[in-house]
Amino acid sequence: TISDIAERVGMTRSLFYHYFQDKDQVAGAVLDDVISEVIARLEEWNEHREAGNISKALDDVVRLTRSLIADEGPFSQRLIEDGNAALYLRFIDRAADRISEYLCGSTVREFEEKHGMPIRNEHETFYTLIVGLISLIRLHPDIDDDIVRQVAAQTLHLDEYL
């Protein structure tokens, strides 16, 4: 309830309503904050990757993805198990969209400048890949990183660059 939220953060209900109209608005703000943290980690990955070393970049982003799905990560199975499936789906949708937007505006453009673009509908392809990999790793946490890497490379038509 809103009273529970206000009590947990140490504010009055009236102060809560000063900033937020309802619980959905709070949830949206929290989701945006968590997604911004994920984007910051991607920006760090992007800044430190070796230009032109696509194989290493894929290895590193697979490790990053796995860390985001770990038990305490933002994409963990625990969020669903805690009864927040609808919120989790909202989160996945928004996160995949923003991550795709970030990658298509940065890493993908750099790749295109050097190699051309082996895929069309970049944003939609990345969105589908992100949602799919999150689900795959969450459902099969023991899946080998090489398989995850191969799925990403095949989806993005990167095999000839590895």
What is the role of each PLM region?
Residues 39, 85-113, 120-124:
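Amphipathic alpha-helical packing segments from all-alpha helical-bundle domains
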Residues 29, 43-71, 126, 149:
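Hydrophobic alpha-helical connector segments
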Residues 60, 66-93, 135, 139:
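Amphipathic alpha-helical segments used for helix-helix packing
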Residues 64-66, 116-139, 146-157:
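Hydrophobic alpha-helical segments that form the core
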